[in-house]
Amino acid sequence: MKTHTITKDQLDDQNRYVGEADLTSFSGHIEISADLGFVKFASKLVATGRIRAYSGSGIEAGEGIEAGWGIKAGSGIEAGEGIEAGWGIEAGLGIKAGEGIKAGEGIEAGLGIKAGLGIEAGLGIKAGLGIEAGL
């Protein structure tokens, strides 16, 4: 499976992704290099494989974030809509979604987990601070 790695040269001065690859429906893995801060995506971020942001990098999408495998970020994960992974979702800081959060395996955050709708995991849900869901 191919991997697209996001580096600093693919970001504008507001840390928005401006690279040439279409990451709204990517066939493969998406990786975000370390120490980039929160990398912002105007709409959704979708990969058939995993989505991973290394230490010091986080993911922020205007719409949803979806991975066929797992989603993991050294910092936080935030989506205007839902977050869904076939495997687990893990963030060094918080996980926040305007709608639901769903993982085939576990959901884990160093701080809080918050969803506008429900939170569902095939295995456990763990947060260093609170867990909050609208429904």
Model-derived regions: residue spans:
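Charge-rich, low-hydrophobicity low-complexity segments
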Residues: 1-92, 96-109, 114-115, 120-121, ...
